[in-house]
Amino acid sequence: MNIVPILQNIFSLTNSKNHTIIHFLGLRIKYKHRNIPEQSHPISTYVPGYEIHGQNNKIIIIEENGSERQLLPNEKIDGLNIRINADNSLVRIQKPTKFRDCTLLIENNNCTYDIKSTIYEIGGTIFHLSAPCCKIQIGHNLSTGCGTQINGFSSENVTVSIGNDCMISFGVIIRPDDGHTIFSPESKQILNYGKDIKIGNHVWLGEQVIILKGAVIPDNTIVGAKSLVTKQFQP
């Protein structure tokens, strides 16, 4: 008995240049390969300066007196490596800020990264926007520990917002979608759209907390170490 056709009906894997398609028990999971710009360092490695590919991308610096200006071609933001491979992206950084070994990677069009001033250190954090029209909005006085990631943007028009005076510990992961797309085998409609994440003011996220799509964390909340939050958090 040839069981290969039977196994293929249960599970199969197809690779193309841009996607991997997994068929499993009637579900069709389509995973888009990320188009990461060629670089001599991995994303998690800090490289001083910035690199931009694409059209109409802007990096705006807001000075302490409120005036705004574009980042100069030879200017660096201490502690923050910016890499953009997209069009119409907007980065707004209000001074003062204290980045250390951080990376901002934008890989799709019409994305926004907006961070207010902070007197605390933002350390070892990756901010990664990889789908169109997505946003990361951060209020005043954020602090983060090493290994924190705000990424997983595979759905369009998804926003992660973090309020004022928030403290994020080590190894925290904030993901507004699943990182891949699942389609209905009958209708071909997407089954797992991303959802916004909203973190209020005066929030403390403990070590290795995971915040997933649709999470809402109200003001004045502490989330204990290694907790998983997937919906509106009830303090």
Model-predicted segments: where are they?
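Flexible, glycine/small-residue-enriched loop-and-beta-strand segment within the central core
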Residues: 89-215
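Short, solvent-exposed secondary-structure boundary motifs
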Residues: 1-7, 41-43, 71-74, 229-230
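Short, surface-exposed beta-strand/loop "edge" segments at domain boundaries and coil↔beta transitions
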Residues: 23, 27-31, 68-71, 90-92, ...
